[in-house]
Amino acid sequence: MVEQNKALVRRWFDEVLTRGEVRLVDELFAPNYVLHDPGFAYEVRGRDGIKRFAATFRAASPDVRFAVEDQIAEGDVVVTRWTARGTHRGAFLEIPPTDNQRTVTGIEFDRVVDGKIDEAWVSYHLFTEGTLDPERVKRAFNMIHDAFPDLRVAQADKVAEKDKVAFRWMMSGTHEGEFMGVAPTGTRVAVMGMDIVRVGDGEILDYWGEFDVMGMLRQLGITPPLERADN
């Protein structure tokens, strides 16, 4: 069953998002589907909502191609790590078109019920930094802890398969130090993030992580919220 669920979710990336076959949404998704995308101020709901979401994404980058880098599945949940590449020709989120080639990385948790994608959570990075060595990872975590000294992370979901484990989590804290050039505001923020780790011999061998940087900046008053994606 998990392999069937993986194949179902892969069709979303390969056939709908990459090829633009939006008509397949009715076949792949449950009628009451919900997408929790932190890039939008509201949840995307229903088949019509996800059709508009896919159309918006492809309008921003008509030549977009999604590559499924990895999938992990357990029970009714499929976790997909993906990379999207395309030319930025239309506005997407708060970013106006640049006509530049853009690469976006992301992780998505999809829950499958009765052979349909019923609910999803996605986190992505619009400004991909590539591979970080251990020292840069330490600096990144130190920056976050310095900016949010009371930081708390709560696990929301966990999926494991073979030597990989995926986590979905919520992070909260008070902005008391500089963060990405933003002076302390005293604002309490809460954002979603996702990690995938590969383990061996009691150690973490590889780590892939995404969290809602845009949502955090929005809560700090840096960017305006977007309009509903399902209106």
Regions found by a protein language model. Give the residues of each.
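C-terminal and inter-domain tail/linker signature
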Residues: M1-N231
